[in-house]
């Protein structure tokens, strides 16, 4: 006996179309296009979750470097000075400190300079 996919297909299609909400034009309305775009979107999402970490690290380093140069030291010498001084602050914290608390950052820079 032949089995038709009636409700199963509808459920499967609805699931894909629900996830495609917010896509443009036929990529939201047509099952095949929606499925293809959704697959692509998930690939982008996976890739960009990895890239996000790299991008933020780059941003933090840029901010720290700018703040270091205002205090007459290069980024690399500053990081070397921190490790020699035994100060274990990560780049996220240092970048935040450089942006929001320049006086505290200056004190850290002075300790790093003294350790060199």
From Swiss-Prot:
Molecular function terms from GO = rRNA binding; structural constituent of ribosome
- Gene Ontology cellular component list: ribonucleoprotein complex; ribosome
Gene3D superfamilies hit by this protein: 6.10.160.10, Ribosomal protein L20
Q: Which UniProt keywords apply?
A: Ribonucleoprotein, Ribosomal protein, RNA-binding, rRNA-binding
Q: One matching Pfam family, short form?
A: Ribosomal_L20
Record keyword RNA-binding present = yes
In terms of domain of life, where is this protein from?
Bacteria
Q: Which SUPFAM superfamilies does the annotation name?
A: Ribosomal protein L20
Q: GO annotations under biological process?
A: ribosomal large subunit assembly; translation
Q: Which family does it belong to?
A: Belongs to the bacterial ribosomal protein bL20 family.
**What's this protein's function?**
Binds directly to 23S ribosomal RNA and is necessary for the in vitro assembly process of the 50S ribosomal subunit. It is not involved in the protein synthesizing functions of that subunit.
State the protein's name: Large ribosomal subunit protein bL20
Q: Which organism is it from?
A: Nitratiruptor sp. (strain SB155-2)
Ranked from the top, the taxonomy reads: Bacteria, Pseudomonadati, Campylobacterota, Epsilonproteobacteria, Nautiliales
What gene does this protein come from?
A: rplT
